[in-house]
Amino acid sequence: MTRPVALITGARRGIGRAIGVALAKAGHDIAFTDIAEDEAVAEASKLFEAEGAQARFFRHDVAAVASHAGLVADVKAAFGRLDLFVSNAGIGAPIRGDMLEITEESFDLVMDVNLRGAAFLSQEVARVMLVDRPQRPAIVFVTSASTELVSIDRAQYCVSKLGLSMWAKALAVRLAPEGIPVFEVRPGIIRTDMTAKVAAKYDARIADGLIPAGRWGEGEDVAAAVAALTSGQFAYATGTVVNVDGGLLIPRL
């Protein structure tokens, strides 16, 4: 019997790579994408293969909606199946600053990747799953604590993630009668290349009590949630939101 296949976007490093390792450990072969191809791709492939997975990289820009059908077809051609989709690729605000100064170009870029691209790629995957009927399908969206927390210096990022959260809920309702669960994982402050530039800021805020757990999150924390949700042990759950944030989103006085 062939292993189930997971397609993970934005997985050559960071959270996506950690998710790939976790799903490889759980018995999946890994199809992974990113917008760039560099030494990190080979490193990621080695990590996935070390867990017994077949791994294949597909260079892909999630914002290029016209290329989505080709990507999914290429994954099917390479592996013969597609069982799980993890929408992880995303970008931050190109320039942080006053939201009254956000340009149309900056706003559109973030929306094209984080919302529009992610939504339409999940649409393509869902269509294929409805035809193929994999035994244990699932779709997971990696969003952000910024679905609930406002950052006025990167408002377009917050809007994009909140929009994707609503898309995940709508897709969960649409696919529930078809037996395809849809989940959302909301990372909090996670140690990645994207957050490296603001590490000093959040080191100080964490020390001041911003996060009840008292530490940064790691990519492996997010990956553990994705692996659990897609394990097949939550057969009556869909539309579920899991916060992986050390308690950041808990309202406190």
Give residue ranges: language-model regions.
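Catalytic loop of short-chain dehydrogenase/reductase
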Residues: 91-92, 135-177, 189-190
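Short, small/polar-rich loop/turn modules that mediate ligand/substrate recognition or access, typified
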Residues: 176, 181, 237-239
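Substrate-binding pocket helix/loop in short-chain dehydrogenase/reductase
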Residues: 96-99, 103-108, 207
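Conserved glycine-rich cofactor-binding loop
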Residues: 12-13
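Conserved glycine-rich Rossmann-like NAD(P)H-binding loop of the short-chain dehydrogenase/reductase
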Residues: 26-43
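Short C-terminal tail/terminal secondary-structure segment
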Residues: 96, 209, 227, 238-253
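Alpha-helical segment proximal to the catalytic Tyr-Lys
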Residues: 127, 173-174, 235
